[in-house]
A protein has these predicted regions:
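Conserved, surface-exposed functional patches that form binding/active-site neighborhoods
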Residues: 33-113
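C-terminal, charged low-complexity interaction regions
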Residues: 77-156
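Histidine-centered nuclease catalytic patch
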Residues: 1-36
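Conserved aromatic-histidine-acidic binding/catalytic patches
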Residues: 5, 52, 132
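Proteins with a high burden of low-complexity, intrinsically disordered sequence enriched in S/T/G/P/A and R
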Residues: 1-6, 35-40, 45, 78, ...
């Protein structure tokens, strides 16, 4: 623990995905395998202030890019690239189960983008980039927003 005084400070706590779903764990255990860990389970106690990209940081948005296949990549900013790659690796953000889940959500969105104008796509991206009335975001919203903006502004 790098900052023991902050261990239970509410402003220092982040919710993390469980590492794998119950269904995924059961399926793996039935076949005598361990599920592929990701997120907090894989991260454990690792923390490096210079190499960890927190979702609370402003640089988080530029630190990652997404493909329509659900893969997460380091952002194009050279100053963030090393931290982005290390965060992806340490949290297992390209675990096959996460890629599949992101791809499923992205395929659903992509299935109707041809029906929308660029302005409507931009409005959708802006709406998804904000929490709802309960302070929650749509699952994989950052990937959805990235892909929508890439469709609107393909050369950025």
């Amino acid at each position: 623990h790098s900052y023991p005084k902050l261990s239970l400070d509410y402003s220092n706590l982040l919710a993390s995905c469980p590492g794998y779903s119950e269904e995924e764990a059961l399926e793996h255990f039935q076949h005598g395998k361990l599920p592929q860990e990701h997120c907090g389970h894989l991260k454990g106690s690792w923390y490096d202030e210079k190499l960890m990209v927190s979702p609370l940081e402003e640089r988080c948005e530029i630190s990652f890019r997404y493909t329509a296949f659900g893969e997460i990549l380091a952002g194009s900013s050279l100053e963030c690239k090393e931290a982005s790659l290390e965060t992806i690796k340490r949290l297992g953000l390209n675990a096959s189960s996460l890629q599949r889940a992101r791809r499923t959500v992205l395929e659903e969105i992509i299935s109707f983008v041809d029906e929308l104008s660029d302005e409507e796509l931009l409005n959708l991206a802006q709406d998804l980039d904000k929490p709802d009335d309960e302070g929650k975001y749509v699952r994989f919203y950052s990937a959805i927003v990235y892909v929508l903006k890439a469709l609107i502004f393909p050369h950025k």
